[in-house]
Amino acid sequence: MPIGVPKVPFRSPGEGDTSWVDIYNRLYRERLFFLGQEVDTEISNQLISLMIYLSIEKDTKDLYLFINSPGGWVISGMAIYDTMQFVRPDVQTICMGLAASIASFILVGGAITKRIAFPHARVMIHQPASSFYEAQTGEFILEAEELLKLRETITRVYVQRTGKPIWVVSEDMERDVFMSATEAQAHGIVDLVAVQ
């Protein structure tokens, strides 16, 4: 039986009464948010709206994005990445558990020097994929061309954000490459590994 979203006490500054809010709303008020599922349009829009709102509210205080995600839709993930680059506050990314596929792309998009992985976190990069099994030939060709463009864009971002040569990133993206937290740090995807 699911327990639902826990409620926690919260008191607004200057108010005497405590109210009970769900834990995510409480954490949002502290500028902490979570990507703990597959990336899709819905979660992408929620994270984007949170980043923009909190950026408008106070543009000098960092935002913190905790990631434990198997990846998901490429375009939705790229929208999160682009928003992270657009908002004025630095977005610190913290990998806890897994940042795979487009989630690792979001992880590498955190502010340089402020990308962290927990000691037992795993990171996986690979090339974007699609399912062609029911496409007509013309659609197949157009989709393959779009995938190549997306791969070039993703590769370019990894090169820029990690400092690795393009041939290293391209070679790694040929297959699923899983990394420990320290390997991700050596690869330039994160800057720090949290101390145990």
UniProtKB/Swiss-Prot annotation:
The active site is at 101 (nucleophile), 126. Gene3D superfamilies: 2-enoyl-CoA Hydratase, Chain A, domain 1 (3.90.226.10). It comes from the Eukaryota. Its EC number is 3.4.21.92. Cleaves peptides in various proteins in a process that requires ATP hydrolysis. Has a chymotrypsin-like activity. Plays a major role in the degradation of misfolded proteins. Component of the chloroplastic Clp protease core complex. This is ATP-dependent Clp protease proteolytic subunit. It comes from Barbarea verna (Land cress). The gene is clpP.
